[in-house]
Amino acid sequence: MFARPAIRMRCATGLLAIGTLLMLAGCGEEPKPSVLEQVKAEGELRVVTRNSPATYFQDRNGATGFEYELAKRFATDLGLELKIETADNLDSLFASLGHVDGPVLAAAGLVETPQRQRQARFSVPYLEVTPQIIYRQGETRPTKAEDLLGKRILVLAGSSHAEQLEALKLELPELTFEVSDAVEVVDLLRMVDEGQIDLTLVDSNELAMNQVYFPNVRVAFDLGDTNTMRWAVAPGEDDSLLLEIDAFLERSQANGTLQRLKERYYGHVDVLGYVGAYTFAQHLQQRLPRYEKMFRQAGHANQIDWRLLAAMGYQESLWQPNATSKTGVRGLMMLTQRTAQSVGVSNRLDPKQSIDGGARYFVQIHQQLPESIQEPDRTWFALAAYNVGGGHLEDARKLTEAEGLDPNKWMDVQKILPRLAQKQWYSKTRYGYARGGEPVHFVRNVRRYYDILTWVTQPQLEGTQVAENGIHLPGIDKRTLDEQTPPL
């Protein structure tokens, strides 16, 4: 009869105790801020990456690279300053995550693997790549996994490729390979190119960015399925930063940012075959030193990156001052007679006059473009107009807009330019027929040559060679002018 009231009393007492504890807890310390809140409070986004053409490197105009550009945009979205540090190897990269005052994000072209899942947490994917077995031109080409047996194979320590080969050993116990934490992808490709090792395994995007430096390397076959690149964060206390990263990457995919970055860094990397790469490497050693000072002076005088001028000159004439085409354009920068007169060039075969005139003409074109065209597209449009003329370029922009594409984005206009050679299209334009595929080819090649010149003239590479056999890309002679030339 009295049991129910007793239970009620005990319940009331228990609730009172719980309430008291909650009140006491409320009088204690503030809840710990989330990882994202801590990052924002510090005012900077600390990112660790790798030093390579496909990720991040410094040239005379500052930091560049696919991963750097993407991380910079993320920092800007958060209203933070970007602080970059580079890791000596992949093990140290992952080890640095989560340290006090260390990086909070790894943006380094990383593939998620079972082993790495114990070291970090990964974002949604942003780039697809394929792991590829690389061999040396002239050697027997492997075509299947069994062909790897008995070969000297070297890969990066701590890489997804090392894990992939370990997994392959379960099927092929005789397989042997080595790992090193003292090399980068560039070193692996150089070692294959020079015959120091038989094979390596790298991702397709890394090969695409670097193959031109090593004309002897070839893809043997794809090993396994396509992988996806992701950013990584430390296995922290909450998901706030990771969720913000995922949202940023998904927005970047939806609004075209990722596609534009892919086009900028990878949309032109496959334009040089073996012959083109080999020839360019030779001409860098044998021809560029004669004209480098002229390119630097013209770049400085016209506020153009001298390496862009040099890339244009190579595409136009292979750095030959006496070059002449069947259409009458002449000289190192291949100027028409009318253009030469308009920029004060009296002798198109004089290399200094030609380079100076080409620089002035390019600046004129660049300045005349509509304000709606922003960098870096503005430079690509100026290159196209340099090649095909501003009128034809404007025709292509109008056709692009009519197709519902963006007339201010090179990645859209380059798709339409070849139509200027087709009657059904050029008959609708003001300036008529043009070989519209040529400016697309011109821009793509100039961009590739410019990329190479930018990479090999890094301060840490100047005066050195990428390889020892005399056919690869030399550093630029330190005895020539050393002023920093700002880009357009």
Swiss-Prot record:
Example GO BP: cell wall macromolecule catabolic process
E.C. no: 4.2.2.n1
Annotated spans, Non-LT domain: 26-269
Region (LT domain): 270-488
Segments traversing the membrane: none
Protein's membrane topology: Peripheral membrane protein
Any Pfam family matching the protein: SLT
Keyword Zinc-finger carried by entry: no
Catalysis: reaction(s): Exolytic cleavage of the (1->4)-beta-glycosidic linkage between N-acetylmuramic acid (MurNAc) and N-acetylglucosamine (GlcNAc) residues in peptidoglycan, from either the reducing or the non-reducing ends of the peptidoglycan chains, with concomitant formation of a 1,6-anhydrobond in the MurNAc residue
InterPro entries, A to Z: Lysozyme-like_dom_sf (IPR023346), MltF (IPR023703), Solute-binding_3/MltF_N (IPR001638), Transglyc_AS (IPR000189), Transglycosylase_SLT_dom_1 (IPR008258)
Domain notes per entry: The N-terminal domain does not have lytic activity and probably modulates enzymatic activity. The C-terminal domain is the catalytic active domain.
Protein name: Membrane-bound lytic murein transglycosylase F
